[in-house]
Amino acid sequence: MDEFHRYGKEDSSWQQCFLYPLFFQEDLYAISHDHYLDGSSSSEPMEHLSSNDQFSFLTVKRLIGQIRQQNHSIVLFVNCDPNPLVDRKKSSYSESVLEGLTLVLEVPFSIRSKYSVEGMNEWKSFRSIHSIFPFLEDKFPHSNYVSDTRIPYSIHPEILVRTFRRWIGDAPSLHPLRSILYEYRNSSESLQRSIIVVPKVNTRFFLFLWNNYVYECESILVSLLKRSSHSRSLSHGSFPQRTHFHRKIKNIFLFSRRNSLQSIWSLKDPNIHYVRYGERSIIAIKGTHLLVKKYRYYLPIFRQCYFHLWNEPYRVCSHQLSKNCSSSLGYFMRVRMKPLLVKTKMLDELFIADLITDEFDPIVPIVPIIGLLSREKFCDISGRPISKLSWTSLTDDDILDRFDRIWRNLFHYYSGSFGRDGLYRIKYILSLSCAKTLACKHKSTIRVVRKELGPELFKKSFSKERELDSPPFSSKAAARSQRERIWHSDIPQINPLAHSWQKIQDLKIENLFDQ
């Protein structure tokens, strides 16, 4: 594979490299078999391989031969096959074939992604999860419209094959991919036989297909957004009484009236910013309502025409930040005006100026969090704490640890907000629910539990607040923490409540369009 990388670096015609012979290399399947063993041992036990079973490369080659001899006309119109290649029980041989196919296809993909993003400049880091936080802090306050789009998981197999065909010149290497995709589609339990649903599982094959599909969408979309957001540079121009504008000459475009020779100068800022996290993509736009409306209709049409993919209207939601709050990452996102008092001293005179700046202000959604806690039986719909009956069979330490973990995750997750006072209400609900759960377990009252356990009741639980009161966190540090936000890069994975709340928000939007 290193030879393919060197070949792609030296020769620009790396698309014509032949990948099909790699499917018959035994070393390739040895690597894929090791990947399968490592993944199985780390996640779940292997049920289909015993200690006496030996991996046979001849069986793998027979499976590849079966792929070559398949009748594609039967695969297209028959729902099931008596000898499926994609085993739903996840056998070692079918997984090795998928791993080997993934390793082969990753060779040109890695070369293409490496040399295609070099010319994208500031757009090259929009795929990283770490880019979402600079986007919110730097780009979000300077935008007046935000569009949130859900990237669908339902993809037709032929769309995936044609996506690979655009940058792989070796057509025979795509026949195994087409056969496996159609057979997986036919063996699926979904009633929609015309599409393939890429599952959200940690399978290297499906993750590679999903990442390649999203990369193809973004590589075209971002280039169009970049082209539309940057104007043509001009070499000269006259500005009477505005000589300080000569530094902004590159952000100026010129257009002429049809019936007049007078030229009109206008400023144009780079006003479109894009970022993606998970299955959601955010586009922040600074412009008029007409411009936002055009982009809202352009994005679904772009996906329909280029990828033959239908986007429902509720998948593209645009919000005006001055009037509404957008929901993302489990926060209510808004922009508020922040007054600043600037004092300037020149010689013996003191000048005071009042400035107003836009500041990004994420809000903790207290009411939705209480609604989710009520669904998990920690409180009722009004926020009144109740006992967690399903945890009464656990030990006292386990109960305290579980409540402690919930509160720690919530406080850690919403540390990116200034106003965390509403979290104390959540703390009250969890602490009282913990006390009621212990009282229900010991068949007593909350007063008796507090009297018996005393300060030991919450010694292990809800320790995050005590960490802020500890000596390393002085009063000045605590006051500074109220004025500063701390974004943690692991928040998209640690809080299932945020994902559940996002699903509820999506369902509400879908119901509005169904009415």
Swiss-Prot record:
The keyword tRNA processing applies. Keywords: Chloroplast, mRNA processing, Plastid, RNA-binding, tRNA processing. InterPro entries: Domain_X (IPR024937), Maturase_MatK (IPR002866), Maturase_MatK_N (IPR024942). One of its GO terms (molecular function) is RNA binding. Pfam families: Intron_maturas2 (PF01348), MatK_N (PF01824). GO terms for cellular component: chloroplast. It comes from the Eukaryota. It is found in: Plastid, Chloroplast. One of its GO terms (biological process) is RNA splicing. Transmembrane segments: none annotated. HAMAP family: MatK. Usually encoded in the trnK tRNA gene intron. Probably assists in splicing its own and other chloroplast group II introns. Belongs to the intron maturase 2 family. MatK subfamily. This is Maturase K. The gene is matK.
